[in-house]
Amino acid sequence: VNKLNFYDIDKEFFLSDELYEIIKIALDVSDKTNGVYDITVGSLVNNLGFGPNLFLDNQYVFESYSLKFSIDDKNKSISKYKDVVFDLSSVAKGYAVDAISDYLLANNFNNYLIDIGGEIAANGSSKNGVWTIGIQDPQSLQQNVSFTVTNSSKFIGVATSGDYLNFKYLDGELVSHSIDPRITKSKDNNVLSVTVLDESSVSRADAFATAFNIMSLDESVELSESLGIKVKIIYISDGLIKYFESKSWQNMNYE
């Protein structure tokens, strides 16, 4: 990714198979969220101190990625039109979990749980039965569990996005690592934590969890219901902790 970020404008950059797949997943989620999920926010992330001290002078503009770069599916390459800075941290961990899961299944390992930075794949069963995954209470300093999900002996991908583990104070103001590209700064909503379940892709769950963490609750409700996404959102309303569960989440047998 660093090579891509440093690469010249208007020159074709050839992607590895893995990087191509990651970017294609990300762009699909970007399309479905009207650009709220944006992998070109790298300069904003860096300027807020959540990334390296690179590309700090790059000016971010919220606009369609088609105005920033193009991807050639035949050659698996990218050509940048502008000095965009890619940040794939919101999908790369999920992709790594998927890759390990695929490897295990290909080698006939059918009972496993994989966890990379909170992005999880579970399949089959543990020695004690189904896998039970605890989702942290976003307001608990002791990492207490807010709720649990199980895989019911099937494959599930679980991704959780929140700001309770990655934030800082700048000039006395709480700053989140979750960037809303529409306002070019940390998100401004009442969402504390988002958990997405996907029955085939941790990568996709990872990206959508990030998007729902950035969007307003109303936006997330509308989008998750229209796409049939299994999502549970913890949020604050009138000073109280509340939960939203999409219809797809309510209808599953994993909780």
Located regions from the model:
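Mature catalytic core of soluble alpha/beta enzymes
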Residues: 1-255
